[in-house]
Amino acid sequence: MKKLHVFGAGLSALTLAVIATSAYAALKDGTYETTAMGNNGEIVFQTTIKDGRITSVQVVNSSETPLLGQEALSELSQKIVDWQTINLDAVSGASKSSAAILQGVNGALIQAGGSAADLKSIPVFTQLQPGILPDVRTDVVVIGAGGSGMAAAIEAKNRGARVILIEKQPNVGGTTLFSTTSFTAGGSKLQMAADKPFTAEDFHRKLLAEFGEDSANLKQLADRSGPTIDWLIGLGADLTKVINDSQHVSPTGKALGTVVVPVLKKEVDRLGIDTRLQTKAENLVLSPEGKVTGVVVSSPSGRYTIHAASVILATGGFASNPDMVAKYTPQWEGYPSTASRGSTGDGLVMAQKAGAALSHMDVAGPQTVAYDTGHGAVSLTNVRYNGAIIVNRAGRRFVNELGNKNTIGLATKAQPEGVGFLIFDQTCLERGELLKKYKAQGYFVEAPTVDELASKLGIDAAGLKATLKDWAQVYATKTDKAFGRKDSIFSAINKAPFYGQKTSPANQVTFGGVTRDTEARALTAAGKPIEGLYVSGETADQFGHGVSIAITTGRIAGEYAAKHALGK
């Protein structure tokens, strides 16, 4: 593969050349790797050119901010392929990320044989007119290439099945990519080697206490979570630090999604799994007997059917679909989303049409501390897990900051203006890379004293100082009599400088989904399995914690879908 490094301040979107088909028809076929400087460092791109068209733009490596830079890269890569041009406006709030991808593709076109003269600005938008393409056949098709879908595809492939993995967005990762906290589990090798082992049974009890409803699926999640995190670590995921008994985190404080997604993507590539990006599932194919036998998909190249013995729906939840939020979780209507833009409930709709039942659709796990950057909401959950507290305008705590997400979200919603304030100190900040990165991006208000921080945030200084005095006692005794917090008590919050930020809830995780059994089979309202249809991750009805649900249930779905497809 040929490589070109693109440096400098870069061209603006308005001055970048428009590449019409006639202008680059003679470019050499191939995949070209380029780099360009984004907001948080260099970004690596791979641009594929075939038969005079840009057929793919992939982001190979990026440290851009989730929901801003990362989403801008996804959006523009799709537009470049769909419209066959790099004369595009920057995505609002992500100008550096936008400029980087336009530079990167421009560099690839030059490397493929283009010249400055070829890349002249002409207002041509050559939309590809999709046609009907030949059908394809496989054993297992996985719909959705987030954490759950990739885990399912890997498991099915390892069990001998032929697998096709499709994703409607230009990049893999889904909402898993935006997770900033931890992989919760019980019975992992690290946990069992601790002075006080934390077993799968302990984890099951913890989940039951948090969600209040037991099921065979909840027990299975607890039992399988330990082997799943062991598997991820074996693939190279650096989640080798355990905090608060159940949470596996990066020792350096990296965001969970940026650790997990690249590892899964690497394994998908190593196994040679047929991955088709910008490929949207339109509807499931059903036999006269009601079996699911495939899926009709559309891509920039055309529309076709993938026939498969097993279909896995791993399309995520519906946190980014305002209409579904209003219908199923109206308590969070009008709040922004910190989930992937692809979390629009597609799989739930398809499953219902195939006869599947939905359960617990009114239960959501909102992002409890979202910060409005002015360009979108960003999760600051990682701050809670590094020792912060949450207070209201009076400077007083009002909830267990590490409790049930829904409880925290509703408690925050009930405060004046529906907001809370994260409060923490330098000790908390120094615990991980992500908090330092957030500080550099201007996400925190900083002050040398508690009084000045309170003034900047607009909260009562006397109330905040009284709260911090109480918190010092919680830190000293590791006992929170007021709210029962037991986890992440890492700082007395007394080391200057002090930090804070106004936050509010946001839509992120939806727990309701397709009713399923412990073999991941979608069930009808009568409890009958729908042959050939499997569900995982947020698409499934499953209580638990985001990425732990995604990867664990993904592997379960991949296992049983492969067994069904291969007749085992």
Language model feature labels by segment:
Residues 87, 91, 162, 171-274, ...:
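Conserved N-terminal/central alpha/beta ligand/cofactor-binding core
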Residues 299-370:
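Glycine-rich loop(s) and the adjacent beta-strand/alpha-helix scaffold that form part
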Residues 348-350, 356-461:
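An anion/pyrophosphate-binding glycine-rich loop and adjacent beta-alpha core
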Residues 130-148, 164:
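Beta1/beta-strand and adjacent pyrophosphate-binding region of the FAD-binding site
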